[in-house]
Amino acid sequence: MLFRSERRKQKGVKPLVSERSIRIAFAQVMDALREVHTHKLLHLDLKPANIYLRRDGTPILLDFGAARQTLHSDLSQLHPMYTPGFAAPELHAKRELGPWTDVYSIGASIFCCMLGLPPQSAIERKRDDHMETYLRELERVYSKQLVTLVRWSLALDPLKRPQSVYALQKMIRPTEPPTEQVTAAHNPSSLLSRFRRVVR
């Protein structure tokens, strides 16, 4: 069966969410997440359902329950709630957490915006990883640079991922200055709201 991205290309349909829209929105998400990390906090449950777009197109990170716990908890003892597909493998294995854990979730969220489906869960990937097949198909619709960013972020080995959000920020910035914000008014389905149905 053809992937959604390939079917869209064959039909001459635009990507599910434009690359420019993804870059603009997630550049701002990364700005916010970098600020969170500056305060020695981790989000730990980043996914499209926890990114809210205001009417002016500005994304807001929601659900900081797990992040608040890190103020008073040893990360090695912290077992936050997480969503399969968006959670890094170290969350499942209860290993050391860090900014690289949220980086995995960023990659998973961008992947969801590209394909309309969440990635394989980290547990499934360790048994039989199909993600590379999906990523190669997405290169037919999106730039190689953006797909490389997602691939890098979704590395199962935490040491092979970017260790901070800063490295991703340099790759995600739109190649041209935005001429207008991505707003719910201009795009009724909005950039991320349609994907909340996927993860609920």
Task: Name each region found by the language model.
Residues 161:
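Conserved HRD-motif arginine in the catalytic loop of eukaryotic-like protein kinases
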Residues 141-156:
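Conserved C-terminal C-lobe helix
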Residues 25-26:
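Activation segment signature within eukaryotic-like protein kinase domains
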Residues 29-41:
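Protein kinase catalytic-loop region centered on the HRD/HxD motif
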Residues 76-90:
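Conserved activation segment of eukaryotic-like protein kinases, specifically the C-terminal portion
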Residues 90-100:
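Conserved end of the kinase activation segment
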